[in-house]
Each structure stands twice: as structure tokens, then as C-alpha cells.
Amino acid sequence: MRFSKQKLFRLLDILDTNSFNETHTFMVPKGYWEKFIEESDPIDKEFLNEIENMAGSKITTSATGLIAFWGNFTKILLIPPFPIMKAYRKPFIYTSSIREFLEQQYLIGVILIRLGKYAVGIFQGDQILDSKSGSRYVKGRHKAGGTSQQRFARIRTKQIQELFNKVCSITTEKMTPFKKQLDYIFMGGEKHTILNFSKTCPFIQSMEDKIANRIISTREPSLRELLSTPSKVWGSEVKLFQWPDS
């Protein structure tokens, strides 16, 4: 299940308040799982192997790393919204570093694009610094065959490229002043459209190392939709395997 930042803070409050016995805390960056296990004591190794067996490699090799509250009676995993930079372990429930992580005020670029509509914005934490949204007509698909279909396809392809060019131009204009400071760029819309747009936009290609793997769910790009993206960006995946009786 997906938790908002606020809901995740409430979960951390509950964990802190109850201080469940024999629950260890693990924070593991991407690509560090095997080494993290090697560096563990026998008790931690047992818990970490159990996590791997119960959650699977898809979780332990997450693109943003893994946070775990794990013991004999408590088994909770978190997939954070942004990459974990530092590994740590505690033989008790420890939420301070996670809270600091969630309170970061990242500078984030957002591009929402579907065929016909777009929205581009810059956020510092939850605050929007600059944005632009709009539309550009793109014909729907043509079901008939023959010459008319080919002509229609050429027109549609041209319109799509014109949309991509416009969105790329706006993205470049809005994000260039923040280029060196940007922490991440998130994109939202249909995966196929996003991939094709990314291939045609030099600015996006130059920022490849800043592009987040996760695609933001977007119904229809607009300023209103853009303003809702921080809550989506900061959502964490929570997997509750066991919750102790309180």
C-alpha cells in the first residue's frame, strides 16, 4: 500500500510510542544489500535473510533502497520515495534518520505530458516556484485504411512532434535556471509518450542522471494536476508483513 508523507509520519509516531521489543531498524541504499548482509552480526543476518525470503529480490534491489523495522513480532518494509544515501542499522526502533530524510526540501522538476496536453513545474519541497501548462491539438487515431489513413498518420506524427518540441522548449526555459541545483526530475503521463518525448528533447537527455525511474500517475496534465504532484512524489510503498498485538 502507498502511504503519503503525513501518513508515514503517523506510522513512525506509532512505532516510536510503542517501542516494540526486539525490533531492529535497517536502512539500506540501492545496490548495497549483499554487502549490508555480509557486514551484519548473526542476529541481523537472520532478520535480513528473512526479509529477502519474504519480500523477494524485487524489494531488496529497489531503485531507492529499503527501510525495514524487523524483528520476531514486527515486520514492516518501506520503499522510500527518494534514494537512500547512507546505510545504517540499529538493534531497536530508530526513526530519527528516516524523519530527517522525509523532511528534505528537494528541488524537483515535474513534467506531465499526454498527447494534446502538458504541464511543467519546479518545486522546492511542496512549494511551486514556476510553472506553465497548456495544450496543443493532436488528432486521434484513424481506423480506416488506405491512402487517407497514411495521410492522417503523417499529420498526426507531425502534430505529436510539434507537441514534443513545445514541451521540450518550455521545459528547457523553466528548468535551465535551476539546472545545477535540481535534485530530481519526475515525469507523469503515459509511459510510451514519455519515452518518445524523452528521446526528442536534448534538455532531458542532458539531465538523464536526474530523471526519476518512477512515472507519476496523471489523468490529464493541468496546473491543478501539477499542484497535486508533491504528494504523489513523496508517497512511500509500505509492506506490512506482521504487526504486533498492542
What do the predicted segments below correspond to?
Residues 1-246:
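Terminal alpha-helical anchor/extension segments at protein ends
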